Design a protein with these regions (language model features):
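Conserved catalytic or regulatory cores that recognize and/or transform ribose-phosphate-containing ligands
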Residues: 1-153
Length: 153
């Protein structure tokens, strides 16, 4: 089984790398599942293309920036649609200024891929769209892990 690790990157601390690393280890150790980590895959693409300053292109060369980010979008959505068995998503303040997480959750729902959403916002602030795209909603990662053990162990 393969989990896609969704959640804020662009406006999250260290692109959400720490929580993704913890979840990757837990999934491997407890369920034998692998992951698609968009932080790692995006960094690999940046390294492969020598595009370490791509964020500056948003101001200096918007078309180049858009073209580059579209390649990252394609890579991420392909991972959700064609490779992932389920999506684990952290919904917190880090997703509110971005758009990728919204798209990943929506496209997973549209393709019938389960979305396990860990919500850290007040429930009344959680978008009805995102709530309705989620298969199950959790208050924290411990609840999510208990559920994953029941489902996949």
């Amino acid at each position: 089984m393969i989990a896609y690790l969704s959640g804020g990157m662009e406006h999250a601390l260290n692109e959400g790398e720490g929580r993704r690393n913890k979840m990757t280890k837990w999934l491997k150790d407890n369920l034998g599942h692998s992951v698609i980590d968009p932080v790692k895959s995006s960094r690999q693409y940046v390294d492969d293309t020598g595009s370490h300053n791509y964020r500056a292109w948003k101001q200096s060369d918007p078309e180049r920036y858009k073209d580059f980010v579209r390649k990252l979008i394609h890579q991420d959505l392909d991972g959700v649609i064609n490779r992932a068995d389920y999506v684990i998503c952290l919904w917190d303040d880090g997703v509110l200024k971005g758009g990728g997480t919204h798209g990943e959750v929506t496209i997973a729902y549209h393709h019938g891929i389960p979305v396990y959403l860990v919500n850290r916002l007040p429930f009344e602030d959680l978008s009805g769209w995102i709530f309705s795209c989620s298969t199950e909603l959790f208050l924290d990662f411990d609840q999510l892990k208990e559920n994953l053990l029941k489902l996949y162990n």
